[in-house]
């Protein structure tokens, strides 16, 4: 099980350790001893039950908590299960109260978020709507912008950064992909914007992407060669020529899940800053160069471009 559906319908990564910690706290609160081994065993049982009953769909947080209750009772820990049930009820009330307060602040234009510079500004639904419409362009008849905004309100909180708001917006749109394929395209656009922000800086200009791609692509290849992470022959390619051959528009061929998998698993990342270092087209070209590296030096760029054309246009899928 890799994902779970949150209470507002958005999708989040499933974290098994949270089940273990929730049960541990319930045992500690009732002063009933247990062991790490027993907690791990019960956690594994909960996960197995969920995977059996949700083979093709995503379980909700409530489903996960229901199975925790059942396992605790089945194991005979009735006092612990009772505490866990009360805990769930009390925290539901707390969440509802907090959500009410956030919604009131939004209505009063009093909810503060932080810009990249650290400056506090009021969260503006109108500003988010205007920004979102840039990504919805072309799918206006298929995407419910007002519903997305209504769900986003349950994700924002006091002191949230503008980057976190963008990520939350992406997650809300992602959770709606099952409604219409258009949501996958919009979510991919939102994710692509974050990737570009990581690679080129948060203030990148969309009308300068060709130049920026060429510059950063050459820098990345040379850096990897210098660090010993790439074959030295990679720096012998005409990097400026290959960088300028990148077809930026092909980034929009991606659906959300494909782009998310590529960016999180295969694109280079700065381990310290936790920032993505290359765009999808840069990755395709880097792979194409690797495939062409054994060619005669005079043929390498030509062959690399041929491989890139196949990869970038999804001809091989």
Where are these regions (language model features)?
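Extended catalytic cores of very large enzyme megasubunits
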Residues: 1-317
């Amino acid at each position: 099980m890799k994902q779970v559906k949150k209470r507002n319908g958005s999708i989040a990564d499933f974290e098994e350790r949270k089940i273990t910690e929730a049960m541990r706290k319930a045992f500690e609160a009732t002063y009933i001893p247990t062991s790490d081994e027993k907690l791990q065993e019960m956690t594994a049982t909960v996960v197995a039950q969920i995977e059996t009953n949700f083979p093709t769909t995503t379980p909700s947080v409530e489903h996960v908590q229901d199975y925790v209750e059942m396992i605790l009772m089945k194991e005979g820990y009735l006092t612990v299960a009772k505490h866990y049930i009360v805990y769930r009820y009390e925290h539901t009330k707390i969440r509802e109260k907090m959500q009410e307060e956030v919604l009131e602040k939004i209505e009063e234009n009093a909810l503060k978020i932080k810009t990249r510079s650290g400056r506090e500004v009021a969260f503006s639904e109108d500003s988010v709507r205007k920004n979102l419409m840039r990504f919805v362009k072309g799918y206006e008849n298929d995407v419910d912008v007002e519903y997305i905004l209504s769900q986003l309100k349950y994700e924002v909180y006091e002191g949230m950064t503008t980057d976190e708001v963008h990520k939350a917006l992406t997650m809300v749109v992602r959770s709606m992909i099952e409604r219409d394929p258009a949501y996958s395209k919009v979510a991919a656009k939102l994710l692509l914007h974050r990737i570009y922000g990581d690679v080129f800086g948060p203030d990148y200009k969309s009308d300068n992407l060709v130049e920026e791609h060429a510059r950063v692509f050459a820098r990345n290849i040379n850096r990897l060669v210098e660090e010993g992470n790439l074959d030295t022959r990679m720096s012998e390619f005409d990097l400026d020529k290959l960088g300028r051959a990148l077809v930026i528009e092909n980034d929009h061929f991606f659906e959300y899940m494909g782009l998310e998998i590529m960016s999180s698993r295969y694109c280079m990342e700065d381990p310290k800053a936790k920032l993505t270092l290359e765009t999808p087209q840069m990755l395709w070209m880097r792979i194409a160069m690797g495939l062409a590296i054994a060619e005669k030096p005079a043929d390498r760029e030509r062959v690399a471009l041929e491989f890139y054309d196949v990869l970038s246009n999804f001809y091989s899928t």
